From Swiss-Prot:
It comes from Streptococcus pneumoniae serotype 4 (strain ATCC BAA-334 / TIGR4). One of the primary rRNA binding proteins, it binds directly to 16S rRNA central domain where it helps coordinate assembly of the platform of the 30S subunit. This is Small ribosomal subunit protein uS8. One of its GO terms (molecular function) is rRNA binding. Coiled coil: none annotated. PANTHER family: 40S RIBOSOMAL PROTEIN S15A. GO terms for cellular component: ribonucleoprotein complex; ribosome. The lineage of its organism: Bacteria, Bacillati, Bacillota, Bacilli, Lactobacillales.
Length: 132
């Protein structure tokens, strides 16, 4: 089966595993998925991320995070820039997700960054997703 949007598939798998209260999620690896997973870890949305190398493309193991009473840390994930409709923002037009409570993940010339990091580095780019 040919997958037209692997990033949307990755975000949907995280959303579904989160809704079902799974502890661990495994997805086929790619560089952009690794970058997104590392940003989610760095920003505190997931517990841990492991990259498992195999003879093929590898696997990313994401350990989801929940609050002390089982409440979800990730409320929602939204794919913004899609293969059929790319969304680019200049550095002065970078979005704030829920007035700074969420993050926007951007693909920039400096690599994958959050909206806050892109503002600090003074770069714009393609808005991959919103997470809150």
């Amino acid at each position: 089966m040919v997958m037209t949007d692997p990033i949307a598939d990755f975000l949907t798998r995280i959303r579904n595993a989160n809704q079902a209260k799974h502890e661990v999620l495994e997805v086929p690896a790619s560089n952009i998925k690794k970058g997104i997973a590392e940003i989610l870890k760095r920003e505190g949305f997931v517990k841990n991320v492991e990259i498992i190398e195999d003879d093929k493309q590898g696997v990313i193991r994401v350990f989801l995070k929940y609050g002390p009473n089982g409440e979800k840390v990730i409320t929602n994930l939204k794919r913004v820039s899609k293969p059929g409709l790319r969304v680019y923002k200049k550095r002065e037009d970078l979005p704030k997700v829920l007035n700074g409570l969420g993050i926007a993940i951007l693909s920039t010339s400096e690599g994958l960054l959050t909206d806050k990091e892109a503002r600090q580095k003074n770069v714009g780019g393609e808005v991959i997703a919103y997470v809150w």
